[in-house]
């Protein structure tokens, strides 16, 4: 088994400014997933030009392996503005692993009040898989990482950036996070 570096690179257009001074705008969210034994990558929303077309509210990428004994080594998340890292997070290696089951690591990006975002596949180093999303998120984004055994959810990590009151399950909360909530 060899280690593959799979990079998800989301470039978000300028976020509309708000009067809240605690909110730090960003224009790039880089997510790197380090995993052993990845056999294939599934994605969706491919158009005729082999470009991935993004609907932020529904878009999901799944990385599937035939066995969950590999788990993942780590996940790095960088929040970047004008090529400067303004915040970073690291999720340590997964501890819940099962042999003999299909392992799915799913990553989902939600952008609310977006304006014509789109996505395309990066054609570069074959050891690296990355996607770039461009557009404007006026209210903030939510990024979810889930790890599953077959259809059983093992772990879920959520990163919310910006005005995320719209991300509660009912959609009517008055609470929002003005900076980052992980």
Curated annotation (Swiss-Prot):
Keywords: Host endoplasmic reticulum
Keyword Lipid biosynthesis included in the entry's annotation: no
GO cellular component entries: host cell endoplasmic reticulum
Subcellular location(s) of the protein: Host endoplasmic reticulum
Main location: host cell
Coiled coil stretches, renumbered: none
InterPro entries the UniProt entry points to: Poxvirus_TNF-rcpt-II_C (IPR010806), Vaccinia_virus_B7/C8 (IPR009176)
Keyword Transcription regulation tagged: no
Origin: domain of life: Viruses
Annotated family: Belongs to the orthopoxvirus OPG192 family.
Name used for this protein in its record: Protein OPG192
């Amino acid at each position: 088994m060899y280690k593959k570096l799979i990079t998800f690179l989301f470039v978000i257009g300028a976020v509309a400014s708000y009067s809240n001074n605690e909110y730090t705008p960003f224009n790039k969210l880089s997510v790197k997933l380090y995993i052993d034994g990845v056999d294939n990558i599934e994605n969706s929303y491919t158009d005729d030009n082999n470009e991935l077309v993004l609907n932020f509210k529904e878009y999901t990428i799944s990385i599937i392996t035939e066995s969950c004994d590999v788990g993942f080594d780590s996940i790095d998340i960088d929040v970047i503005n004008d090529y400067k890292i303004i915040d970073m997070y690291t999720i340590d290696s997964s501890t819940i692993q099962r042999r003999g089951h299909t392992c799915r690591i799913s990553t989902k990006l939600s952008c609310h009040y977006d304006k014509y975002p789109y996505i395309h596949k990066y054609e570069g180093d074959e050891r690296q898989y990355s996607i770039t999303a461009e557009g404007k998120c006026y209210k903030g984004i939510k990024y979810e990482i889930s790890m599953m055994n077959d259809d059983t959810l093992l772990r879920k990590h959520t990163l919310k950036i910006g005005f995320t009151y719209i991300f509660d399950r009912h959609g009517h909360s008055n609470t929002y996070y003005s900076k980052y909530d992980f």
